[in-house]
């Protein structure tokens, strides 16, 4: 499902009084349900996304403590635990990003006051455009810059965050799958993901044609709902992306999947979340009070 055609130049920005395009119905209709494309006002000309300003982050231990990077050829289906051994430092990858085959994630930029101001501005506008009371739902919020070499994949994965990814420099293709498609993401994968394994999501090339495919360029962004599997690739330019995201404070989804994980390990075929409010509430109560394994099965069977 191709969302846009590729363009070599940045799209026209939204009205200057806003960060996002205020007339986009996706914010209100599809927020945290379906991926959608939007426009934004950030490009590489913005002072916070120029390379010297980003490079300053490397001198901030509050941010660099959470930074992650890798380099080398990465196939779409590679698990994060199997990534190539790093032979360059983060600064070396950044300074040689055009040739390093690198991918860098500068996390928790909100610890830098200037980036935190951008994050707050973005989330305030998201609240207004979606009509959602995000502050009451969120556990945490985060700003991230992604920095990628030309012709580089980011492997298929699932995130716990509700995310708005904005392309700032270069071109990038985003492939997002419907989180409710159980051919793409079986219940067992989600159970494992929420219980113990960040690498639980497995890419299945036979279902690639079900992806929402977005061709991102400076001034465009993609909303990625929680649990929506995705993978990315860059083209012939260095790619810079800015992400704003938050995690839900509500643990209901997590606890039901964790309960089902234990049930499946014990040979039970568990009822997926959302099918029975009674079962879901029972599972949440049991997991939240520390029951697991056989105790969980006995409790759910009424023994």
Question: Language-model segments: which ranges?
Answer:
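Active-site-adjacent segment of 2-oxoglutarate/Fe(II) JmjC oxygenases
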Residues: 206-208, 254-289
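Catalytic micro-motifs at enzyme active sites that drive phosphoryl/nucleotidyl and oxygen chemistry
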Residues: 24-26, 91-95, 131-135, 150-156
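Transition-metal
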Residues: 2-124, 262-268, 291-303
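A short beta-loop-beta micro-motif enriched in histidine and acidic residues
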Residues: 153, 157-163, 189, 209-210
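Double-stranded beta-helix
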Residues: 167-223, 228-229
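A short hydrophobic beta-strand segment most commonly corresponding to one strand
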Residues: 187, 236-252
